[in-house]
Structure formats: structure tokens, C-alpha cells
Amino acid sequence: MKTIGMLAGMSWESTSLYYQLINREVQARLGGVHSAKALMYSFDFAEIAALQNAGRWDEATVALSDVGRMLAGGGADFLMICCNTMHLMAEAVERAAGIPLLHIADPLGAAIKARGLRRVGLVGSCFTMEKGGIVIDRLRARFGIETIVPEADERAEIQRIIIEELCRGRFLDSARATHRGVFERLVARGAEGIVLGCTEIPILVGPEDASVPTFDTTTLHALAAVEMALR
């Protein structure tokens, strides 16, 4: 079994889900009391969020690259960034660490393609929805999948919910209702599926909240990490 290097804590709410998903899948596949071999570095998300909000992406890249090198030096065989947004610097982290990085968009794209879909709605942080280099460009280039995002006011409200509620462990019915409305408006604009493109959002909503297939990036990423670890 390979050792997974997890760049985590962005936020810890979704990191706890990643850890459960990965270990449950390893145990399901191997049986007994097996669990994943993993090294985890948990960031103080307040520091990362401050860099995001200030547009200091170069500093964020340095921070994640340093941790990637540290995990590689500690024995990790490959890396995963447990956050959609911070895949903006995925290639830089992979270069710095010198070991493979499992990009969150790759298992996502494979899952969408397996369902035969070509156009999906993306819901995530404002950065993920607005910066093509995180998920949108990779889905188009590697899988031929078109992505549409909510309107500007909806993106702002989703970002508020993520930071003020989800990352603080508050999963409210009002936020669930907001997301359901956004999903249906994306479907009305032609979305054939909905990408839950923030690692906290799948804790709030699931397949029952949309009229089209949903794609949970957290679960897809975690299961792909197990597949890579056991290959």
C-alpha cells in the first residue's frame, strides 16, 4: 500500500470526512482492521483564507509547496490537496514535491464522462466558480466537459454560506434551500448534472437535493486516492 500525503485542514470539517471515507474504503477492500497509510498536514484555515481573500496566491503557493515537499520527505508516495480551491496551485505543488499529485478534477471528470454528460453546473467557492484554472479548464481540456456557474449574486451567497456556516460546522436548512434553488436554476440553463465543487458542500446537500445527477468531489477524490494507494 502506498502512503498518501494529505494537504488538509481547508477546512477541518471536510478533512474529517476525507479521513473517514479513505479509511472506510481501505477497510472495505482489504478487510479486517486495515486502514490507510497516510501523512497529513493540517493547515490553520484562517491563514489560508486570509491569503485567498487578499489575492495573495503566490504566498499560498509557497505555503502549500513547502508542505508538499515536507510530506514527500516524510515518505508520502503521492499527494492530494483536500480542497477544491487550492488546486489553483496543484501543478506548482507537484513540481515542488517531486512526487505525483492526484488532482481533484480527474476523478470528477471521469465520473461525469461515465454518465455520458457533457454540460454540468458547478457550485463551490467563489474562487472555484470564477477561476478557470482550478477545475473548469481541466474538465474542458481533458474530458470535453462544459461547465456553467451560478449568477454573480448566487456565487456571493454560496461563498458566504461556505465561510460563515459550513466551515464553522453549521449546516442549516436555509443553506440547503439556497443550494437547491441554485441547482434548479442551473438545470434550467442546461446543466445535465451538478458538481458539488467545495469539499464542505457534500456535508450539506446530496443527490436528493437535485433533479439531475450530483457529483461529490470529496468522495470521488477520496476513493480515487484509495485506488491509487492500492494500485
Label each region the model flagged.
Residues M1-R231:
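Non-catalytic structural scaffold of enzyme domains
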